[in-house]
């Protein structure tokens, strides 16, 4: 399982529409609007790096109103809770 955080800058009037569009993409688990140098963060969980590449370059990058993205790939999860089991449910 590959987990990535996609930092996204958008045309602000389209923020809600883009959030909905992102959530409609298979592999996008969560979307947050945030303060700071980026407008949104999408949490992505896919099986393989190739899927992540396609998702970022072909699906997310093609959405109207997205100005820029930066992708962070998680190496390891540290949590008080066992999130691995939760994230693995229904993802084949």
Model regions: which residues?
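A compositional/biophysical signature of low hydrophobicity enriched in polar/charged and small residues
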Residues: 1-92
């Amino acid at each position: 399982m590959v987990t990535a955080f996609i930092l996204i800058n958008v045309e602000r009037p389209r923020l809600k529409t883009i959030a909905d569009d992102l959530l409609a993409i298979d592999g996008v688990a969560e979307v947050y609007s945030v303060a700071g140098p980026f407008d949104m963060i999408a949490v992505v969980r896919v099986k393989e790096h190739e899927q992540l590449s396609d998702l970022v370059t072909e699906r997310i990058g093609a959405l109207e109103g997205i100005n820029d993205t930066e992708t962070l790939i998680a190496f390891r999860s540290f949590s008080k809770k066992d999130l691995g089991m939760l994230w693995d449910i229904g993802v084949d």
